[in-house]
A protein has these predicted regions:
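Feature marks short, surface-exposed loop/turn motifs that line or immediately flank catalytic pockets
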Residues: 14-17, 56, 85-87, 117-120, ...
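N-terminal binding-site loop/beta-alpha segment at the start of enzyme catalytic domains
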Residues: 1-77, 134
Length: 168
């Protein structure tokens, strides 16, 4: 697969059932039975970049997507997921903790694109991304929902560590 040509991401925000799934925002009830044919049709059509986040359905989205991606060769799937500051735990490094939880969920040793989901504290949450890239747990990093000043600051913080901001 030519990863440089990936320009369509399939989002999974509405995946999951009940109050922590698609019901909360979208009013839908998409579980594994409804989503398996969607995933397979996308895969057959050559779509492979999947965007999710731990906060989507409080894990439901990642778990559903992981159930499907485990059946595919890892090199055929691009996983994009996010660190969401508002649900960060009390660990010494909440960014790494959330990333490790996503890695375990997907049964993989790397995430293709890892995002800071929103700009709650650019100075606090951006530096740990560089460590994740350097460790090999994350291939590329991005920021989501940041304004221009926050994007510039995140870019500078990462550049100081020798890491590029790959997506906004």
């Amino acid at each position: 697969m030519n990863q440089s040509s990936l320009n369509i991401a399939l989002g999974t925000w509405s995946w999951g059932e009940g109050a922590v799934g698609g019901d909360e925002v979208f009013g839908n009830h998409f579980g594994e039975a409804e989503l398996a044919p969607v995933f397979e049709a996308a895969r057959v059509a050559g779509l492979c970049l999947w965007d999710t986040a731990m906060v989507y359905g409080m894990g439901a989205s990642e778990h559903l997507l992981a159930a499907f991606t485990r059946e595919c060769p890892r090199e055929d799937i691009q996983i994009s997921t996010k660190f969401t500051p508002q649900i960060a735990g009390d660990a010494a490094d909440p960014v790494a903790e959330m990333c490790d939880n996503s890695l375990a969920c997907f049964g993989t040793d790397y995430i293709d694109m890892y995002w800071i989901h929103n700009p709650a504290d650019v100075e606090r949450w951006t530096p740990p991304l560089a460590s994740l890239v350097k460790s090999g747990k994350v291939k590329r990093v991005g920021v989501s929902n940041h304004n221009l000043a926050q994007i510039k600051r995140a870019t500078a913080i990462l550049a100081e560590a020798g890491v590029a901001l790959s997506a906004v």
